Design a protein with these regions (language model features):
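Ligand-binding loop in jelly-roll beta-barrel domains
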Residues: 82-106, 113-116
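Generic protein-terminus/edge-of-domain signal
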Residues: 1-76, 82-83, 118, 129
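Short, Lys/Arg-enriched, Trp-marked, Pro/Gly-tolerant hinge/linker segments that flank
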Residues: 131-142, 155-217, 221-222
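Detector for the N-terminal beta1/A-loop initiation region of ABC nucleotide-binding domains
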Residues: 61, 86, 208
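Short histidine-centered beta-strand/loop micro-motifs
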Residues: 40-46, 63, 88-90, 111-113, ...
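Aromatic/histidine-rich interaction motifs
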Residues: 115-146
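Amphipathic, well-ordered alpha-helical segments in soluble domains
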Residues: 51-54, 117, 141-148, 169, ...
Length: 223
């Protein structure tokens, strides 16, 4: 697992570039030390891969077009494919550290158009209303997933059969998330989360909204 302190983008885009991501095994594990990022936050971005995460310590806030979610230590969740998001470190008392599995769903689904993809993968990744599936302690079903998720980061890439064991664990977690997301999947979403132009426009709005707000307040104070 690689410690990361920054984010890279494809040229001219806010799509995240994932160093070390290979087609023959489309997966990377990361340990994000958010306090070492510039400004203690990860700016607006997206990626085709899904982002399965667990909070090792501290707490972070996830922002998406749909709103904000706070994740303290011991919580976790999954960010859906192509969802615009940003994160920022919140805790000032302990290190803000996030563990991440970032993978293309083909790792679980196999060949494009497979039965597994159609039945269990596509219903989640094509649902625009599902931006994040949060997992918090205190809910029995979510705690079961969190326990398995935390354990999954203890798998060693040096052990025999690592790739198969990892895929098996991620598949088990995905099935549990699939069941948990049933109420979310039954709701209808309207926006197209895969439209890059819309993402860029939304990033501009989010990044400049605060500037406009401060400017208006400044004007009021001097009029």
């Amino acid at each position: 697992m690689k410690n990361i302190h920054s984010i890279e983008f494809y040229t001219g885009s806010k799509e995240e570039l994932l160093p070390g991501f290979e087609k023959d095994f489309p997966y990377i594990a990361s340990r994000a030390e958010l306090d070492k990022y510039i400004g203690h936050y990860v700016p607006w971005h997206w990626h085709k891969t899904v982002e399965l995460f667990y909070m090792e310590s501290g707490s972070i806030e996830y922002d998406t077009p749909g709103g904000k979610l706070l994740f303290p230590a011991g919580s976790g969740g999954i960010v859906n494919s192509n969802v615009l998001h940003m994160t920022k470190a919140i805790s000032q008392k302990e290190k803000n550290i996030q563990l991440l599995h970032i993978f293309d769903v083909s790792l679980l689904a196999g060949e494009q158009g497979s039965r597994i993809e159609q039945k269990y993968i596509a219903p989640i990744i094509t649902a625009p209303q599902i931006e994040v599936i949060p997992l918090f302690p205190g809910n029995a079903e979510e705690e079961r997933i969190l326990k398995l998720l935390a354990a999954s980061f203890r798998l060693s890439s040096d052990e025999f059969g690592y790739e198969i064991k990892l895929r098996e664990t991620l598949t088990e977690i995905w099935l549990m998330l699939f069941e948990l997301s049933r109420p979310m999947r039954e709701k209808k979403g309207e926006h197209n989360k895969s439209n890059d132009k819309i993402k860029l426009m939304m990033i501009y709005i989010h990044e400049h909204y605060r500037e406009k707000y401060l400017f208006r307040n400044l004007l009021r104070q001097h009029i």
